[in-house]
């Protein structure tokens, strides 16, 4: 049977079927010197059938990145047109998985967090005119236990997207560590563990697309030095990527089949629906929606729920008007157009009146309150109210044997004793979803921000396992950083040893996008972004970029910057956002320090003993798992943890007791008993 008959029963209407032909590949290699290490960028040698491929090496670390775009236009929601998947293989370090089937299973938290970081760094610079979904696959081919993979993954993904022609300009990434007032570029994992601060910076020629900072209470001046140092190295990486990309011919998306063409060929599939607003559509949406939108944003007496319901009504009414006049306007397109209009309206209303939608000034934070020990059976609990945002944090403390060995083959094992989870059900933002309690990339990423904010002030000698759970009961913006202060208070209520109290806040910037300027015939040059402290939900979802910051009275512990739309912010704008946020944090700490806490009775103190096992006997130690270990634990009233690499840690009430248990275990190994 012919291909034409398979596609449409012979009804081709005289149209010739065009097949995608990949561009001719040439091998290009570039080396960038970064401090004491060299970053090798290659393309054109591996994965030649992909739209774009990149091979990145640093030391023994090797990452393969491939980029593919869908061959047909997307007709569903494309709020996240870039999908990133990062996978680690135990074979990258010459190991065999210890799972029953001896292969890797689902995504680990490390893989989810790395995928999320890469996606956040690159999504803002994806070509908005591209109607095709893009997928980036990152695979760890060879591991270097002295180097982390985050920045190499961003560089590999950016180069692959650049070769594929689906990104506006290359993005480079680098890690900077502050070790004893000395800045180290791309530090080793051991150096990062002892560093006073570390910064993951991703950006292009004009500014930053992602900033991830965690430190042991660093000052703003030290942070600024790290930002400028990182920016100078990123520019070199971006230039090297641009030189490589210039050697490849990008395949134009118009050469692929669109939905209209496939529909004419007889395939039963949905017609193409554009999702990028045009100037004419933006003008029409503004004419229809502007009066009601201004009323919603200027009514300071309205509640958060009232504003959300008003926005939903506005979206429905605007859609009803526009979809009644044209069959080519989708609801997704209307939503995107409204988002662009809202950014400009927020900007204009604040410029005109000096007030925001809830009546506050641009740099005014909401009043906050904290109530501790509201859950009697929980070790520690705190309810925080920040305007109409409510966060309930609960803390449980257990024995240290409940800690987990993390890292595994790839990153080196370490003992994690603080576990943070963050959840925001759909009811918190007055919506309904198919599954309200789904824990995915977003939740893992938000929990990591809270963990990075609090962990620098934890006492390293605290020998207990801590679980902190943050429930966002209602969210009118700032739902992540609003959980930092109550989380700290809940941990203190549970008896956790902390050096100082921590608080967090968010700062976002609103600025009319380039599309709006073009629609109005204005110029974007010279337009400064407007900073908004402690944003509401509407402001948070319709800003250009947002910065989350946490810190103590002594210094900053965490910073996270995300670019949502528009051009990347330069470093001087980031400095202004940091100053505004940290000033607010120090003011909020005055309120938090006044909260009185009566700690619960601490858990019985226990002793830890780590046993050094010769490399030749580690397999025998692993084989002891089961009844033999259970008998030893029962006999000596202790807990024994054995990792997949044969590392043994014993927990008990006395050191003599643990010494006897370890001797018994080693005797079993010597006798060869399992």
Question: Residue spans of the language-model regions?
Answer:
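Glycine-rich, flexible beta-strand/loop modules in the N-terminal catalytic cores of phosphate-handling
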Residues: 50-134, 140-142, 205, 223, ...
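Conserved structured catalytic cores and adjacent interaction surfaces
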Residues: 436-439, 443-556, 561-674
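Flexible, glycine/charged-enriched surface loops at secondary-structure junctions
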Residues: 29, 125-134, 168, 237-257, ...
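N-terminal mitochondrial targeting presequence
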Residues: 1-31
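Long, basic N-terminal domains or extensions that often function
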Residues: 26-78, 83-259
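Extended amphipathic alpha-helical scaffolds
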Residues: 23-70, 74-81, 252-415, 604-631, ...
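Mobile "lid/hinge" segments at catalytic clefts and subdomain interfaces of large enzymes
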Residues: 164-295, 491-599
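Stable alpha-helical structural segments in soluble proteins, enriched in small hydrophobic residues
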Residues: 121, 152-164, 226-229, 233-237, ...
